[in-house]
Amino acid sequence: MQVILLETIKNLGDLGAVVDVRSGYGRNFLIPQGKALPATKANLAEVEQRRAELEKHAAQQLGAAQERAEKLNETTVSIAAKAGDEGKLFGSVGTRDIAEAISSSTGVDVEKAEVKLPHGALRTTGEFEIDLALHAEVTVAIKLAVVPAE
């Protein structure tokens, strides 16, 4: 399935690009979320007419993400979780827990989808470096300390 991208998507393409994607990814994710349109002649013409508006909107989103990154840069967040004697957690600390902790401690809204945990949820106490993908082009690293709850 061919789609026209309405914003820059990492590992896929830039704004206005016509790309081939799997049908399910296009129909169930990109198009409903307003990130793409089906590649028809009418839609191609419409995107060309709206290109300046779309680029302005993309620049605003990038600027907002960079502002959030500046506020979050070098941030250290602490989460208390129940843990055993050896530092192993009873349960885990996931993306939702991390996003809520960052939002409450810094005042900057962070969505759970922006928190990147390449090795899955955290299951031990200690200090970790967590990446936040605030935009396709903006990533910021924060320090997260998981401490045992009293």
Curated annotation (Swiss-Prot):
A single GO molecular function, which one? structural constituent of ribosome
Coiled-coil annotated spans: none
Q: Which domain of life is it from?
A: Bacteria
Which terms in the GO cellular component ontology are assigned? ribonucleoprotein complex; ribosome
Q: What keywords tag this UniProt record?
A: Ribonucleoprotein, Ribosomal protein, RNA-binding, rRNA-binding
Q: Name one GO biological process term.
A: translation
Q: Which family, according to the similarity comment? A: Belongs to the bacterial ribosomal protein bL9 family.
What is the annotated role of this protein in its UniProt record? Binds to the 23S rRNA.
Query: Which HAMAP family does this entry report, sorted A to Z?
Result: Ribosomal_bL9
- NCBIfam families with a match to the protein in the record: L9 (TIGR00158)
| Protein's UniProt name | Large ribosomal subunit protein bL9
User: What is the scientific name of the source organism?
Assistant: Alcanivorax borkumensis (strain ATCC 700651 / DSM 11573 / NCIMB 13689 / SK2)
